[in-house]
Amino acid sequence: MKIKDYAVDTARAVAFLSRLPMPPALFNGYDGRLGRLVRAFPFAGLLIGFVPAFALLLLLGLRADPLVAALVALAVQALVTGALHEDGLADTADGIGGGKSREQSLIIMKDSRIGTYGAIALILSFAIRAAALAAIVRHSSPLAAVLAIPAVAALSRGAITWHWQRLPPAKADGVAASTGQPDEAAMHFALVAAGLLAALLIWPAFGLWPLVASLLAAGAAGFVCTVFIRRRLAGHTGDTLGATQQICEIATLCALATAL
């Protein structure tokens, strides 16, 4: 594949995973299938992560409290992505928490209204990520914390591809099913790319052990989430993809903060 093909796939992946505008010409003749496109998810996550990272850098430069700066950075990230992954986390929490059977869980997840489990999941997601990011700022440096955001964004988007490829669609008429199953080669490429991107950012900023802890946390979280969803829903949905991203992001930030 040419470098241009990877660049185009990355731009399309950014458009799929966020609200960042991309040139319409990139989608001429594109059928919307994501089988090969998922290989670019870590690169898209990296680019998406630079936006909240800049917000964090700006606020820390203005001597804002680390926790306030972290919360604002996460808010910026949610705006950039349209809260795509947070929505998936909330719907998955509502479905699994409120559904007594697979079928009931899927019906609840399809409901756009947020329930108690979803609200609690969102609150915990923002609170834990903000606390971990603030701890990283306090125990390392502002620049290191800034680099952590795109690194974790790349890792968590790579984890999506594992979850997606390893599980069949839970619903034949679901959004995730309509975009196609990721190619196994594309999934493997995404996992390797996610690890390398994380290494390039985390190792120089934090050292080897925090890098190892981050990789282990992302891998373990993605694996456990996939096994759990397989048992409860027997397949993935668009919501479980978002939930996987959020859980991996939470786990990785916590591991990074703890390893410092």
Swiss-Prot record:
Membrane topology of this protein: Multi-pass membrane protein
The UniProt record lists the keyword Cytoplasm: no
Pfam family, one: CobS
One GO cellular component term noted in the UniProt record for this chain: plasma membrane
EC number: 2.7.8.26
Record pathway: Cofactor biosynthesis; adenosylcobalamin biosynthesis; adenosylcobalamin from cob(II)yrinate a,c-diamide: step 7/7
Catalytic function, reaction form: alpha-ribazole + adenosylcob(III)inamide-GDP = adenosylcob(III)alamin + GMP + H(+); alpha-ribazole 5'-phosphate + adenosylcob(III)inamide-GDP = adenosylcob(III)alamin 5'-phosphate + GMP + H(+)
Reported cofactor(s): Mg(2+)
Name listed for the protein in its UniProt record: Adenosylcobinamide-GDP ribazoletransferase
UniProt gene name: cobS
